[in-house]
């Protein structure tokens, strides 16, 4: 077995690189064709999702295979090899098997335990089978990966450790609130009609949204999805809603208008450019207001007093009414900081800050100095003395300290919630900075998932993966010696046929009954002699390090290498010509 995988994923590369390296359907087909046309690779399959691009191949040379597969990935992704290489990972033989089985179980997903990857692996295998780039090794590998993934989900609680990317994204949008409560009654827009968009629409329907609008470049696909939603969730969607059309389809050019009505939008189109720019989103939320995010000032001051703290005077407040310092130049700054516990606004220089602090603590001498309008060395000396007296009275000496941050003015509550599940992104990242909009995209999901708790069932799945990798390796090593065993039995059959022919020459009067009996007896003797050695050699070959037994068998019986190779090629050709399961 010479299985090699070269790839990159959300674990090895930043989203900015994954976006640029994404492969559309045509690029995947061309990549497969070019891979099997390359010298080191005999089979190939590509697994491309939102969060990973992996090229699997059966190669005869490791280093040449790594170089060729890396070059092909760079060539077809459009990202230069020099830039792409630091983010690539390589797995070989049993490690490659372990990697794919872990991926199939959801252990390597952004949301641990999500089951959508199984469908993507199945599609990957079907694509390779359609192009006849998957032979015996990759057929066995991917089909076993699907079985391992299903076993993990059925025998453990891995589903409780994770969820679909859609559900996780909605949880991030709801900011920790119950998703069903948060979604109930909202109007939803789903952009795209592929598998991820369909899953998003179904998840929103189950969560209890009031209306779902589906937009897609191919209007017929949008209509089909809307019809399915009506059939499956129409009754639930109609609860508490008096509209006649609860799930409907619109063309892509209707998206800007629909976005002005939507409360939540999910986009996953696979487009190469942006579907929603920051300007277009800003235009849709202009004039829409949500619940205020800032509590009333009186409520805040009450909370401060209840906490046992002294409210800090700020620029423009009533507390500044008699302050001798001119704070008008800095009163418009929305954020501030405090020094020595005294309030100040951003924009004060150090001297002004200390004078304001002294006045706030009752520095009447400062007031008198300012009111007198005096200046010069004597006035400065008097001012310094007043500040020193104030410091003595309040029990501390003024000191320079690093400003302590004060929270900026809170953003208004969102009126539009956007979930971008596309790679490359559908929604401009600049939307994160728009007031009134909450955007969750692949990058923010990656950050959030890094802190997600892991379920105990994950350990059980890891044990399943380890056991399945060992079993698969044993089966492959045993299968590797099969062509040699077949060639040995073929040689034995030729020997039997030759000896029977020679016997007929010596005994021309032998009747058919006796000839058949003699032939059968000789065959039984040969089969019995070969049975124990061939069974045992398969067992030995299945063990780690058993690859050498095939060579030993060929040497012992002087088997023709080309005969063995022809048997192997015939088996592989049969697998490649086998259509999707």
UniProtKB/Swiss-Prot annotation:
NADP(+) binds at residues 192-197. GO terms for molecular function: glutamyl-tRNA reductase activity; NADP binding. Residues 292-416 are annotated as: Insert. It comes from the Bacteria. One of its GO terms (biological process) is protoporphyrinogen IX biosynthetic process from glutamate. Transmembrane segments: none annotated. It is an enzyme of class 1 (oxidoreductase). The keyword Flavoprotein does not apply. Keywords: NADP, Oxidoreductase, Porphyrin biosynthesis. Catalyzes the NADPH-dependent reduction of glutamyl-tRNA(Glu) to glutamate 1-semialdehyde (GSA). During catalysis, the active site Cys acts as a nucleophile attacking the alpha-carbonyl group of tRNA-bound glutamate with the formation of a thioester intermediate between enzyme and glutamate, and the concomitant release of tRNA(Glu). The thioester intermediate is finally reduced by direct hydride transfer from NADPH, to form the product GSA. This is Glutamyl-tRNA reductase. It comes from Streptomyces coelicolor (strain ATCC BAA-471 / A3(2) / M145).
